[in-house]
């Protein structure tokens, strides 16, 4: 059985990352979205093990000590982490996993799982990104801060395997889907023991 692919997507705020991930999951039945752990309280409509694994802080800290996270961070006094066992079991079963995460988290996971695939999504221009952020009706100082953060994030794009420009949503989704197909066909991801009888007859 071919191994699953861990696909990590990063993008500046307002680039359409969430929409792209949702479209990918609708299109690719061989792809599963990674469920993260958090210590924050569930929001209305959120379900344990579907949207997040909701944990107490003490339990989360014990998991940190046991090395059960591929990466973790504290955001607004709440802990967030990517569970190692959830992803490793899916990949072993031949299921690819999609993970949307920031550049720091992506770098941390790449160090632990160098075979993961990193895809960075950018807007076509900074002006188009400004327009998207402004359309959200954020305060002007918030837009300026997000744009500054976006420039810093895009400087890290050189550390990724693929760069996708989200000028057209369907095109961007198709390009990422093609990347997943190609990566899944790599010889390094195949079970060569299982294929040995077939390969033995290849001249």
Where are these regions (language model features)?
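Conserved lysine of the Walker
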Residues: 17
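Post-Walker A helix-loop "phosphate-sensing" segment adjacent to the P-loop in P-loop NTPases
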Residues: 26-34
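P-loop (Walker A) phosphate-binding loop of NTP-binding proteins
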Residues: 10-12
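ATP-dependent small-molecule kinase phosphotransfer cores
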Residues: 38-97, 104-107
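C-terminal accessory "lid"/substrate-recognition subdomains
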Residues: 178-203
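Post-Walker A alpha-helix
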Residues: 20-21
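Phosphate-binding beta-loop-alpha motif at adenosine-nucleotide cofactor sites
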Residues: 158-172
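A glycine- and Lys/Arg-enriched "phosphate-lid" helix/loop adjacent to the NTP-binding pocket
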Residues: 40-45, 68, 91-96, 103, ...
């Amino acid at each position: 059985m071919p191994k699953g692919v861990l696909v990590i997507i990063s993008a500046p705020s307002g680039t359409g990352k969430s929409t792209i991930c949702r479209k990918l999951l609708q299109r690719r039945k061989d792809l599963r979205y990674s469920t993260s752990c958090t210590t924050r309280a569930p929001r209305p409509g959120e379900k344990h093990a579907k949207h997040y694994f909701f944990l107490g802080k003490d339990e989360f800290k014990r998991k940190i000590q046991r090395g059960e996270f591929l990466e973790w961070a504290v955001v607004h006094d709440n802990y967030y982490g990517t569970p190692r066992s959830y992803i490793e079991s899916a990949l072993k079963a031949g299921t690819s996993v999609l993970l949307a995460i920031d550049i720091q988290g992506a770098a941390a996971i790449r160090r632990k799982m160098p075979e993961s695939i990193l895809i960075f999504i950018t807007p076509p221009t900074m002006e188009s990104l400004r327009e998207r952020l402004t359309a959200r009706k954020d305060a002007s100082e918030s837009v300026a801060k997000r744009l500054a953060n976006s420039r810093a994030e895009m400087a890290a794009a050189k550390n990724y395997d693929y760069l996708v420009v989200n000028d057209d949503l369907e095109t961007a989704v198709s390009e990422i889907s093609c990347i997943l197909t190609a990566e899944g066909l790599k010889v390094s991801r195949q079970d060569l023991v299982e294929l040995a009888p077939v390969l033995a007859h290849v001249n």
